[in-house]
């Protein structure tokens, strides 16, 4: 079992398999010219899988595949099957923008994937084009339906932005509700690599908008979950992720592995260690020791929760993994 110095059980591993993405979302990607980490510098699926086995054997019970956009990496379903075959009852999930799901949803399900979190910030084609910087909405919505048809559980992630989709929050909630999917509204997380003068809505502003149509009641927060849960009178539940609040970190159970092999204890801290050499050499003992070292580096709270309201991440989110 993995337990950090604050007594939190860490049983959730988020793995970024690529930095690359087929979107250029304004709140994620840099506005200035940048280059991807060369493919030859990324961990192979075999190297990633070696660390996955170490993590599972140490007590990890949940794995989420992220990017970039994970589906742009070739043979992702093969990697998912490797994990599923090793630990069939592992909680195995994927975060995606949904664009490529019409082609991959069934293959992912057959490989052992159980759940998908899908980004959907708007139901308006022009707004979607503005955020992603390409026409995407038709394919994204088709991907949502393809995932449901394949038998995957789908949760929607919506970044709530002032003057952009604040007039759509109720429509997005109803879109998810009528399709028996949960939606989570995410406060915009500032990072120094994506500056578009975007302003996020705070959790109380999101609740105020939804409460104009629905009676909203605070529900019990799920253990280790980052989202605060709210319930409508008909029983439908939705979430709000607010990383600025103190309790966002108090039960954090996750660590992150970047595509190039950096094991990261927290999205907003830079105390990462590389497992690249260990897994390239097939050194399970060294990989396990690095895992323990990173666990020891895991902070009690992120910088926002510590009071740094204007803090931004110095590492771009597409590099760390969503």
Swiss-Prot record:
Enumerate the cofactors the protein uses: [4Fe-4S] cluster
Q: In which pathway does it act?
A: Cofactor biosynthesis; molybdopterin biosynthesis
Sites where the protein binds [4Fe-4S] cluster 2: 249, 252, 266
Keyword Iron part of the UniProt annotation: yes
PROSITE patterns annotated for this entry? MOAA_NIFB_PQQE, RADICAL_SAM
Recorded family membership: Belongs to the radical SAM superfamily. MoaA family.
Instruction: Report the catalytic activity.
Output: GTP + AH2 + S-adenosyl-L-methionine = (8S)-3',8-cyclo-7,8-dihydroguanosine 5'-triphosphate + 5'-deoxyadenosine + L-methionine + A + H(+)
Task: Kindly list the GO molecular function terms attached to this UniProt entry.
Answer: 4 iron, 4 sulfur cluster binding; cyclic pyranopterin monophosphate synthase activity; GTP 3',8'-cyclase activity; GTP binding; metal ion binding; S-adenosyl-L-methionine binding
Domain Radical SAM core intervals: 5-226
The EC code for this enzyme is: 4.1.99.22
Q: What does this protein do?
A: Catalyzes the cyclization of GTP to (8S)-3',8-cyclo-7,8-dihydroguanosine 5'-triphosphate.
Q: How is the cofactor bound?
A: Binds 2 [4Fe-4S] clusters. Binds 1 [4Fe-4S] cluster coordinated with 3 cysteines and an exchangeable S-adenosyl-L-methionine and 1 [4Fe-4S] cluster coordinated with 3 cysteines and the GTP-derived substrate.
| Protein's gene | moaA
Query: Record's SUPFAM superfamilies?
Result: Radical SAM enzymes (SSF102114)
Q: How does it assemble?
A: Monomer and homodimer.
Task: Specify which residues bind GTP according to the UniProt entry for this protein.
Answer: 14, 64, 95, 155, 254-256
Q: GO terms for biological process?
A: Mo-molybdopterin cofactor biosynthetic process
By its UniProt entry, which Pfam families does this protein fall under?
A: Fer4_12, Mob_synth_C, Radical_SAM
Query: What is its EC class?
Result: lyase
**Residues involved in S-adenosyl-L-methionine binding:** 27, 68, 119, 189
What name does the UniProt record give this protein?
Answer: GTP 3',8-cyclase
Keyword annotations: 4Fe-4S, GTP-binding, Iron, Iron-sulfur, Lyase, Metal-binding, Molybdenum cofactor biosynthesis, Nucleotide-binding, S-adenosyl-L-methionine
> Where along the chain is [4Fe-4S] cluster 1 bound?
21, 25, 28
């Amino acid at each position: 079992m993995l337990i950090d110095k604050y007594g939190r059980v860490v049983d959730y591993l988020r793995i970024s398999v690529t930095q690359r993405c087929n979107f250029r979302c304004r709140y994620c990607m840099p506005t200035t010219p940048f280059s991807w980490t060369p493919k030859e510098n990324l961990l192979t699926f075999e190297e990633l899988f070696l660390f996955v086995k170490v993590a599972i054997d140490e007590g990890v019970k949940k794995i989420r595949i992220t990017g970039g956009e994970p589906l742009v990496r070739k043979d992702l379903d093969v990697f998912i099957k490797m994990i599923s075959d090793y630990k069939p009852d592992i909680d195995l999930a994927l975060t995606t923008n949904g664009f490529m799901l019409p082609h991959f949803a069934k293959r992912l399900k057959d490989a052992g994937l159980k759940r998908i979190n899908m980004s959907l910030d708007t139901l308006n084609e022009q707004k979607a084009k503005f955020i992603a910087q390409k026409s995407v909405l038709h394919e994204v919505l088709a991907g949502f339906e393809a995932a449901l048809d394949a038998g995957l559980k789908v949760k929607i992630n919506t970044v709530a932005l002032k003057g952009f989709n604040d007039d759509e929050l109720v429509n997005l909630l109803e879109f998810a509700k009528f399709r028996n999917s949960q939606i989570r509204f995410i406060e915009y997380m500032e990072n120094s690599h994506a500056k578009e003068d975007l302003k996020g809505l705070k959790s109380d502003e999101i609740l105020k908008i939804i409460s104009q149509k629905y009676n909203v009641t605070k529900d019990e927060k799920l253990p280790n979950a980052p989202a605060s849960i709210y319930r409508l009178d008909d029983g439908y539940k939705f979430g709000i992720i607010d990383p600025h609040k103190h309790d966002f970190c108090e039960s954090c159970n996750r660590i992150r592995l970047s595509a190039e092999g950096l094991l990261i204890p927290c999205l907003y801290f830079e105390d990462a260690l590389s497992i690249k050499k260990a897994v390239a050499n097939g050194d399970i003992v060294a990989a396990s020791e690095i895992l323990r070292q990173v666990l020891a580096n895991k902070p009690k709270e992120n910088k926002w929760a510590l009071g740094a309201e204007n803090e931004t991440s110095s590492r771009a989110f597409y590099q760390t993994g969503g």
